[in-house]
């Protein structure tokens, strides 16, 4: 859709309204259906009234962002898994680390969405959901992101460690894994670490194309390095090095581990690491014991064990995964070359990009408010002039402020 134009449009005065037939409008988009609920709002299917194209619109309720920031959670443990009482744990340590670093996330409730926008607006890949437009509804305190429609939803419903899902077919497992692999290779080639690879963030289009989404946890080190600080992501998909107290790790191997956990889920319909709390899951990951239920597939299990290798320094790389016999189907399947897959180069995303990504919206809000006040003043002046004119026409007296006095009704 619109491949010739890669720019992101900003609509600063979009509002939610009702259409003539009683439907819901968001700016120039007609809401067709509700696709699901995210951490910060609802995801809709919507149709452009200008082009007729159908998109997904991702809602960000600013109040929810502020509440999450005030609670100090900022995308910590997900899936409703309770923390053990009396332990600060991994995510408390993360918050302490972020505060020590003076991280923007601690003082700016829009930090997460600004990071996602700054990265998303520069990406162009067939297996990454593209951002087209940002809509700002100041009346309802909501931001909307217009993105590629992936109306078939997540590739697999495995949002919690005790969840069971239908295993994917061998054909779909291979297809969707290679789609995700190409997306991850593209990101890593641009120096972007996703940090939240999981089935929930792998969505399917109507044509069964997998698109990677959700860059709220992603980073792109300005110095071109590969080191990341602090734990991030969803516990069941975290690499073991993230479950330790290390303040700095290499980002790419952690993403590969997470993709390996996803592949395990595709094949077996469950996750390899389980627990009723975040800490139980971390203990399971740290123990490093992986069982392989179902029929034995030597090539597949070799790939899984190498992707979920505990040592990040010896974990399999993306280039090695490309040549793995399970991926190549023993030489009968060929991926697009790395040069073709990564041909759209991304400019380095700086802190300035993150800070200024919403500036087109924020800059114009004072101007909008000023125009609103000007309209009120003009209306008052117009009303006064009209009152003066009516007084002249009817020869009616005026009060001290120039308003027409009402004559007393004659007594009966």
Can you say where each PLM-predicted feature lies in the sequence?
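Juxta-kinase regulatory segment immediately upstream of eukaryotic protein kinase catalytic domains
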Residues: 1-23
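Conserved short submotifs of the Hanks-type protein kinase catalytic core
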Residues: 140-154
């Amino acid at each position: 859709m619109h491949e010739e134009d890669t720019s992101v449009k900003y609509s600063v005065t979009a509002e939610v309204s009702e259409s003539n037939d009683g439907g819901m409008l968001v700016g120039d988009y007609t809401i067709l259906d509700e696709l699901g609920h995210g951490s910060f709002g609802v995801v809709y299917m919507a149709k452009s009234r200008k082009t007729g194209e159908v998109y997904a619109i991702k809602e960000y309720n600013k109040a929810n962002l502020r509440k999450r920031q005030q609670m100090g959670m900022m995308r910590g443990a997900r899936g409703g898994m309770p923390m053990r009482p009396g332990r600060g744990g991994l995510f408390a340590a993360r918050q302490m680390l972020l505060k020590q670093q003076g991280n923007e996330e601690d003082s700016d409730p829009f930090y997460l969405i600004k990071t996602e926008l700054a990265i998303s607006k520069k990406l162009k890949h067939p297996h990454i959901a593209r951002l087209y437009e940002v809509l700002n509804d100041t009346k309802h305190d909501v931001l909307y992101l217009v993105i590629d429609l992936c109306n078939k939803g997540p590739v697999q419903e495995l949002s919690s460690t005790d969840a069971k899902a239908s295993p994917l077919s061998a054909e779909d497992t291979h297809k969707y894994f290679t789609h995700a692999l190409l997306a991850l290779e593209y990101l890593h080639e641009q120096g972007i670490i996703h940090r939240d690879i999981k089935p929930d963030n792998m969505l399917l289009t109507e044509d069964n194309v997998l698109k990677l989404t959700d860059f709220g946890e992603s980073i792109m080190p300005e110095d071109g390095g590969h080191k990341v600080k602090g734990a991030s992501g969803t516990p069941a998909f975290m690499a073991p090095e993230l479950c330790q107290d290390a303040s700095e790790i290499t980002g790419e191997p952690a993403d590969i581990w997470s993709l390996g956990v996803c592949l395990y889920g595709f094949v077996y319909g469950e996750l390899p690491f389980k627990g009723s709390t975040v800490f139980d899951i971390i203990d399971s990951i740290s123990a490093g014991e992986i069982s392989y239920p179902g029929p034995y597939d030597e090539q597949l299990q070799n790939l899984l064990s190498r992707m979920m290798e505990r040592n990040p320094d010896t974990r399999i790389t993306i280039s090695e995964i490309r040549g793995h016999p399970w991926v190549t189907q023993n030489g009968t399947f060929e991926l697009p070359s790395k040069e073709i897959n990564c041909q759209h180069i991304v400019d380095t995303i700086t802190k300035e990009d993150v800070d200024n990504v919403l500036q087109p919206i924020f800059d114009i809000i004072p101007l909008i408010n000023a125009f609103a006040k000007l309209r009120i003043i003009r209306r008052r002046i117009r009303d006064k002039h009209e009152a003066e004119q009516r007084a002249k026409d009817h020869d009616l007296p005026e009060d001290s402020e120039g308003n027409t006095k009402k004559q007393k009704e004659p007594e009966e």
